[in-house]
Amino acid sequence: MYLRFANRKPYEKLHLSTALEDWDMSEELKLSITADQYFAGADDKVERYTLRRQHSTEVSPTRSEEGDYQECTFRPSLWLVVDPNLVIPCPEWINRIPPEPELTSPPLQLQRQLSNDYSTVEDSEDEAPTSCSDVLTDDDDSYNPWQPKHKRKKAKCLGKKLRVQKGLTQLESWPRPPLNYCNLISLALRNSEDGSLNVQQIYSFVREHFPFFRIAPDGWKNTVRHNLCFSSSFEKSSGWVCADGHRRSCLWKLTRQGRRKFRNEMHALSDDLLHVLRKSMKKPALMELMFGM
């Protein structure tokens, strides 16, 4: 995603500067696991991270010129603002941002042609479709040729709104899959061609095979990223994705422990959960093949 600014100089000066200094580091370091990953023995893991955090946040004394110890006022910052074009330049994208098109006046010959065709444009304006109008067939209930034109436009907009609501209702009929996010990520990775995907590809896999996440709030994406970073079931591979001008993103793959954990948890699912899982999939016929059952 590229952002356009009227004046980029103030933002370029923020390179290698700290930001969000009021971020609560103590609360951030507590997020060792998510609620859906709260398995047996998670208390020990939380205590281990808590002890590590307490040890790292202890104030180290420093000796002053008089020989007395003073407290160090330095506080680490979690966020560092960097310019990605300087830190990780993408070789396939030489021109980072396409130039803005210049607004120039049309040639004189074109202006004369437009002035001559002005009456034709006025006559065709009434027939131009609006932004919310679609091609309606005879079976559309919102169409009535005897209505005034402005009422027909409102009816067309209402008909499109009803069709959109009908589509959302169909998506809402899909149940949520009875799997935690760690298993969803493992399912996406084990069904990839080379066993590795980036974050966006994992999102696409989940939305494609489980329609529930197509209309779910985007908070589930944050949970996916959190599990990738903190779960021992995943690790970064040595490959990078950088094509079609997109920023390079790292690839993730399953660890040996992650494969074993996914296989054991899938075989431990009850018949009721398997029934719900099958109903939540867009293509339930691929369930045995995708899950290795």
Curated annotation (Swiss-Prot):
GO terms for molecular function: DNA-binding transcription factor activity; sequence-specific DNA binding. Keywords: DNA-binding, Nucleus, Transcription, Transcription regulation. Signal peptide: none annotated. Residues 104-152 are annotated as: Disordered. Its main location: nucleus. This is Forkhead box protein N5. PROSITE patterns: FORK_HEAD_3. The keyword Nucleus applies. Residues 106-119 have a biased composition (Polar residues). The gene is foxn5.
